[in-house]
Amino acid sequence: YGGTPQGGIISPILANIYLDQLDKYMEEYIVRFDKGKRKEVNKQYRHYQRKKGRAKNALKKAQTAEERDEVLRLVKAYDGLMLKTSSRNDMDENYKRLKYVRYADDFLCGVIGSKEDATNIKADIKKFLETKLKLELSEEKTLITHSETPAKFLGFEIRNRKCSATKRDSLGRKKRSLSKTIEIKIPLDTVKKKLLAFDVVEIKKHNGKEIWKPKARPELNFNDDLEILQRYNSEIRGFYNYFGIAVNCAKQMNNFGHIMEYSMYKTFAAKYRSKVTKI
């Protein structure tokens, strides 16, 4: 028997039934792994915070404009240092967290902890799958990466964003706006695979660079014009509905939509033995 075909309708259902045991195992594992209530305060951040506090106290005692300007310069300098420094100790050994999410036979684990913790978690999952479910964990696909390095999951790239950009809050104070937030992107490779799956693109290489060219779909030549239009619209809409949460969705939709649009024009041109410029 060849098993359930990849991408088949029944595939996710069977995976959910069989891997339900893995879900329960991970629920119990998380309870044992999680540790601490909050990360400890970063000592360097606390140091700058105290220095800023002393400077603000000195501001009340400043008697001349020069003294006041000098103190304000110090306050601003410490504000800048605090914005560049994490307020919490990211490597606090007394604080650990594990998040687990699965769809069909793909799963992703997010770990707040050491690389050793991540290695142990991977080894424990591998052992459970082999002994309890008689499944083999793919070493090639199951990678341990830093949270700032994109991890591939369900066609997306997910990473923990490290960004020094700031914005002002309602009181005019500068705040870190994007640092350590989760960023979800559509990799160009996902767009490429989808277009190849629809058989609407021809990819050639020129001077080491890929050139994407839309192509006609001759299998649609005998379809009604409206059916062809609806087919393309449905595929474009389906791509957007799935990948719309990505931060770069607009850019990649432009790449995807352009190829799809001109593939449709070429399909109509082939159907009516005409040229794209006349469609």
Listing of model-derived features with the role each one plays in the protein:
Residues 1-279:
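Non-catalytic terminal/accessory segments
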